[in-house]
């Protein structure tokens, strides 16, 4: 378990969206944006966490939810599960489907649809678009 000043999170594993979405890297800071356009783009790979209510409220605020990003339940295919605190009957099998909250946005520039679609985000990925913290731009 990881304890933050804003709540607690437990890494559970890796998953992939059942539905395709466009994941683009945009703006001056090279920010990853998951565009809420189901059926377009790629199946997105990401980490799965269990978070407490305190951290969930912090994340909503951090992501500008619901105005900038929207937190919606999405079907996620389990790629690998590492949740060691789960009882055997709570551990989802590989390739099974669970529902997780995902932050995506309907607020984007039309030209973002012409950007490359990524299947996952890594600030140091081979796309060469390293994330720039806001304070480093100013």
UniProtKB/Swiss-Prot annotation:
Which residue pairs form cystines in this protein? none
Question: Which reaction(s) does the protein catalyse, per the Swiss-Prot or TrEMBL entry?
Answer: epsilon-(gamma-L-glutamyl)-L-lysine = 5-oxo-L-proline + L-lysine
The residues responsible for catalysis, as annotated, are 63 (proton acceptor)
GO MF term set: gamma-glutamylaminecyclotransferase activity
Report the superkingdom from the record.
Eukaryota
Which InterPro entries is this protein grouped with? AIG2-like_dom, GGACT, GGCT-like, GGCT-like_sf
Q: What does this protein do?
A: May contribute to degradation of proteins cross-linked by transglutaminases by degrading the cross-link between a lysine and a glutamic acid residue. Catalyzes the formation of 5-oxo-L-proline from L-gamma-glutamyl-L-epsilon-lysine.
- Mind telling me what this protein is named? Gamma-glutamylaminecyclotransferase
Q: Which source organism?
A: Xenopus laevis
